[in-house]
């Protein structure tokens, strides 16, 4: 029988980390991102660029382009020390337009701590 001792705890931790990630995007919280992103983090963004952790943090430090970010249909898939979070999101752009999209974030447990190793958001374009 598989050991499920940490499953609930891991799900709770990853649920909170997902909420922290979204709040950090909305608020430009670079400090929190420094805590939850792996050193080898990569982000594939809708502008077709692949950004490393430093480039992503620089982008997050810029003035916000999004507000009212909300996630629903959040699905967390635990695969041992690796987890994939799929979700639908809605947000408002700086000019007030409501948009929707999806994201897939990959998390890995390293030295007992969950870290985001990849982020892949996409949303409808005007």
Question: Residue spans of the language-model regions?
Answer:
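A beta-strand edge to alpha-helix "cap/lid" segment located at domain peripheries
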Residues: 2-35, 40-126
């Amino acid at each position: 029988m598989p050991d499920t001792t940490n499953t609930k705890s891991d799900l709770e931790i990853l649920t909170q980390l997902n909420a922290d990630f979204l709040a950090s995007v909305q608020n430009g919280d670079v400090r929190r991102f420094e805590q939850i992103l792996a050193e080898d983090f990569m982000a594939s963004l809708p502008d077709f660029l692949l950004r490393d952790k430093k480039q992503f943090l620089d982008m997050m430090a810029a003035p916000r382009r999004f507000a009212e970010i909300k996630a629903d249909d959040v699905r967390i898939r635990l695969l041992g020390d690796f987890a994939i979070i799929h979700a639908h999101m809605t947000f408002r752009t700086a000019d007030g337009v409501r948009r929707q999209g999806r994201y897939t974030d990959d998390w890995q447990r390293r030295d007992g701590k969950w870290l985001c190793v990849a982020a892949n958001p996409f949303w409808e374009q005007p």
